[in-house]
């Protein structure tokens, strides 16, 4: 879904809009499918449409934006949003009178395959359109465009049916929409970094709860160094030496030093 590396919160465009813009419906035929055959058919149709659009159509365009933010506790971090636009029409055709068709500096094309009859759609599914809008904002801001077209291309595989929706946005309008999206999502990213900060401060104050047994401190040091060096450590120690605490405690300390983000402690059912 997302990843946090240091002070960078990284999320894909699709995961961002699905988290922020998804609307409830028990009918998931309009929101995609995990069926392998359907996904393969959708990929084939994507390629077919992309190849039919000519030289002006740029397929699978990678886009990324980094947004500097500050949490409620004053933690500075970067929100990185990235993904691939299905298509971008960067050069627009001109009609006989020399006018652009349509009047946009570029068009973002988002292609969605559905199992329902797309000809019955009256408007784009909002979460799909939101994905295209994010791509549109990133592209328009980086290319300094005054306006951009957002096109949703819906396809039903059998019988093959295509339904398109095209809407033009000024940069000010799409920027306002994007800023509202990020402001809403910032609540969650702020929480992530603020809680990490609280956790780190708590770990730094943590002391080993007992007096070290014989060999226990050396074991803690070995585990910590293995985590620090990102290496495996194999330990053979007698029962009663305190292996559980001697491995978990240095792992928690390493967590406080941001050497890792999570701890997984796996053990057998009856012994540790």
Regions found by a protein language model. Give the residues of each.
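Polybasic (Lys/Arg-rich)
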Residues: 173-204
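Conserved pre-motif I regulatory segment
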Residues: 193-236
